[in-house]
């Protein structure tokens, strides 16, 4: 091939190379797409693919068990087929997957889209500069020409409606957490119960014990991460799908080929004519055929919509339809085996291989839902709706694969309680169906708003979408609610508990922010103090953490009032969430100045998305110093580049942290001896320096941090004022950095209502005392931390 290219004249070669390169790129993209589709089987479809184990058993568990005839079985299969076609295929694959938020999916992604394209967010600290983020608006959306509908104006005007919208989203998140409890219980218990088909002497209690052992092992291994065994997830699910599809095809041909006629919706009409109200009640079991569908949208961020569509249409849909059809064909001739129809329908020669692979598939399904629960809790925390918890990243290569110890053990206890308490997949299925269908129903409502506000389509189209899918899901949900006394109460109890936790934390955090906003220090008072601020300025740099994006927090005045000395350089650091999934590193830092140049006071706003990691990295100090230096240089040159957020304090500039050109600073690796031999005087006493050395010896994660020496370049001419400020910045950095944070005690005012006192003084106080501290959550070095105690009367 190379010889052929070499013989082509140059002008022809130029014409042929772009086309060849286009073919190479197409092949590369095609292979990557197929790889993503392959990997999605182990992450997205585990739950959906294990549903055939218990769908028919749950459907015939109630009064429908009195209708043991072929017509009823045909009607149930027809309902399963059309439900599986309309909800997963038509609604999710064809429509909902297109409503991604920069590649992310789930209820929080829809809510985030709505908050950005309509002013529905309740997050504090929102700024005009946030709207200039490259990930803020969808491609092609222009705010200036956006349609401003009366509905949009109505929602933006009424805060209570925006609060209700947030509560609906949180309720959906709580139901997802409920899935994290119920999915492992029903998947593992139903797969292990297959033993009773061959081991007749095995009693229910022994099956439950075996299931509990498997569940304990599953949750106990979560801290190890799944990267070592994740490569097995996709093959397990694919082999499982091929097995059950082959068995379904065999059963269809062997038992009753006429079952194919039930693909006609006419059998649904005949089913309800035959069963009446009892048929409607059975919908609570039939809906289990689509549980796990939401994972296609929720896990969109790990793949892309095309790969998920390929996997569903290419393998998931045909395999599951064949299995449901074959199982119905078997039941039409063996209705007495309905209590364990899946395992009874397996030919004896392949029973044990199928049993083993079903158990593995159940574990994969459980693992996927547990990981999704960790992800949803992290998103709630990022939006200020969940207490601080320990978040461990279990993979270096896959972003977003996390483990939360507290949530893991809570899920394990709840899952074991459900398994031991109910001991029946039918009862657990009643709870599971309610949780899953509620999330789908909430997605439908949010999707209708996205169609109007984000896609800017007609309200009529949104209403058609809402009425069509809402009526289907509403029918299933209404049927499930009948079964609340038979286990259906579990997701509501779990959701109520987590909703209280989320709302109390959000309410307390918001009240605390309002207190800071109302009691921030006046800039006039700061300016009257002069460059020294009326206190002793000691060598070093102070990072003052605050929730405010503007103004000086009250913690500063509280500190200097009790200890009238502060560092020569002050940086007010605000780490805030923006309703986007990720923020590019080059757009995270907003740098500004507080007061005149001689005050040496700066503001740094670090913006995070709801999927980003909020913590102080090892190189955070150096990044911040370089960003401030670049701001000083840009300000000195009067640069108009970048993005500015005008405010009474001055302008905020977006600093690209990956581009340090123009900072007049150079960085190089430095060993410990170089750092200690610096001529800059330190603000730390000899005793404190010895304590720091001892702390670093006992803390490997601190002592092994990458040390970088920052120096001022002398190769270029620098403005005298800029050079002086840069030198002061470097001197402060080399003298030592201290992290100042508020240690708050939030109390309700005496005039507050009784409910507010309960919420703040009891519930919020309990959560604050038992969650991780902000310094620990942000990975701030303990030896450099100064905490300032303050009482907030809200």
State where each predicted segment sits:
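The structured alpha-helical core of multi-pass membrane proteins
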Residues: 1-794
């Amino acid at each position: 091939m190379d010889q052929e290219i070499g013989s082509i004249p140059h002008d022809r070669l130029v014409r042929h190379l772009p086309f060849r390169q286009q073919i190479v790129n197409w092949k590369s993209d095609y292979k990557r797409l197929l790889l993503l589709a392959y990997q999605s089987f182990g992450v997205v479809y585990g739950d959906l693919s294990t549903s055939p184990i218990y769908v028919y058993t749950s459907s015939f568990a109630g009064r429908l068990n009195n209708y043991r005839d072929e017509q009823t079985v045909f009607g149930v299969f027809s309902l399963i087929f059309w439900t599986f076609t309309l909800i997963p295929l038509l609604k999710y694959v064809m429509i909902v997957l297109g409503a991604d938020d920069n590649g992310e999916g789930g209820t929080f992604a829809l809510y985030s889209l709505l908050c950005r394209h309509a002013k529905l967010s309740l997050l504090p600290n929102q700024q005009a500069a946030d709207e200039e983020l490259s990930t803020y608006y969808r491609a092609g959306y222009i705010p200036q020409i956006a349609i401003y509908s009366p509905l949009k104006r109505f929602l933006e005007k009424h805060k209570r409606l925006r609060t209700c919208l947030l509560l609906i989203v949180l309720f959906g998140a709580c139901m997802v957490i409920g899935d994290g409890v119920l999915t492992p219980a029903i998947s593992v218990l139903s797969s292990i119960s297959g033993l009773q088909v061959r081991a007749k002497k095995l009693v229910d209690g022994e099956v439950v014990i075996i299931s509990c052992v498997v569940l304990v092992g599953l949750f106990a291994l979560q801290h190890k991460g799944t990267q070592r065994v994740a490569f097995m997830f996709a093959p397990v699910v694919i082999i499982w799908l091929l097995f059950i599809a082959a068995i379904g095809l065999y059963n269809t041909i062997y038992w009753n080929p006429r079952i194919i006629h039930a693909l006609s919706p006419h059998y649904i009409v005949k089913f309800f004519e035959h069963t009446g109200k009892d048929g409607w009640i059975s919908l609570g079991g039939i809906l289990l055929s689509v549980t796990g569908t939401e994972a296609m949208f929720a896990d969109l961020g790990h793949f892309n919509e095309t790969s998920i569509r390929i996997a569903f249409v290419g393998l998931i849909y045909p395999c599951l339809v064949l299995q449901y059809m074959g199982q119905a064909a078997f039941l039409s001739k063996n209705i007495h085996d309905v209590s364990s129809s899946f395992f009874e329908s397996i030919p004896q020669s392949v029973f044990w291989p199928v049993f083993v692979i079903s158990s593995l598939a159940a574990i994969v399904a459980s693992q996927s839902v547990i990981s999704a629960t960790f992800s949803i809790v992290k998103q709630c925390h990022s939006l200020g709706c969940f207490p601080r918890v320990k978040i461990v990243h279990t993979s270096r290569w896959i972003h977003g694969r996390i483990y939360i110890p507290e949530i893991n053990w809570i899920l394990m206890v709840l899952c074991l309680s459900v398994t031991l308490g109910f001991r029946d997949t039918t009862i657990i299925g009643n709870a599971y169906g309610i949780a899953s269908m509620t999330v789908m129903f909430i997605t439908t409502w949010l999707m209708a708003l996205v169609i109007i506000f984000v896609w800017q389509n007609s309200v009529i189209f949104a209403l058609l979408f809402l009425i069509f899918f809402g009526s289907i899901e509403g029918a299933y949900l209404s049927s499930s609610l009948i079964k609340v006394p038979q286990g259906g109460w579990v997701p509501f109890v779990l959701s109520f508990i987590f909703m209280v936790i989320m709302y109390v934390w959000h309410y307390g955090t918001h009240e605390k922010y309002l207190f800071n906003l109302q009691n921030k220090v006046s800039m006039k008072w700061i300016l009257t103090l002069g460059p020294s601020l009326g206190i002793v300025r000691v060598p070093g740099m102070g990072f003052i953490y605050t929730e405010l994006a503007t103004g000086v927090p009250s913690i500063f005045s509280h500190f200097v009032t009790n200890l009238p000395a502060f560092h020569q350089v002050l940086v007010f650091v605000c780490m805030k969430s923006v309703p986007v999934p990720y923020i590019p590193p080059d757009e995270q830092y907003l740098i500004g100045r507080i007061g005149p140049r001689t005050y040496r006071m700066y503001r740094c706003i670090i913006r995070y998305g709801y999927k980003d990691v909020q913590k102080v990295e090892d190189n955070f100090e150096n990044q911040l110093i370089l960003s401030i230096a670049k701001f000083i240089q840009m300000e000195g040159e009067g640069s108009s580049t970048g993005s500015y957020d005008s405010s009474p304090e001055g302008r905020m500039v977006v600093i690209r942290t990956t581009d340090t050109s123009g900072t007049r600073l150079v960085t190089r690796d430095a060993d410990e001896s170089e750092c200690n031999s610096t001529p800059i005087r330190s603000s730390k006493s000899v005793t404190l320096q010895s304590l720091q050395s001892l702390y670093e010896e006992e803390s490997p994660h601190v002592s092994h941090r990458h040390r970088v020496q920052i120096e001022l370049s002398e190769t270029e001419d620098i403005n005298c004022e800029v050079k002086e400020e840069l030198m002061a910045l470097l001197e402060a950095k080399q003298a030592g950095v201290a992290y100042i944070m508020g240690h708050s005690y939030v109390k309700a005012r005496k005039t507050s209502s009784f409910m507010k006192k309960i919420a703040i003084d009891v519930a919020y106080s309990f959560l604050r005392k038992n969650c991780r501290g902000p310094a620990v959550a942000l990975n701030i070095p303990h030896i450099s931390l100064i905490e300032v105690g303050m009482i907030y009367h809200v």
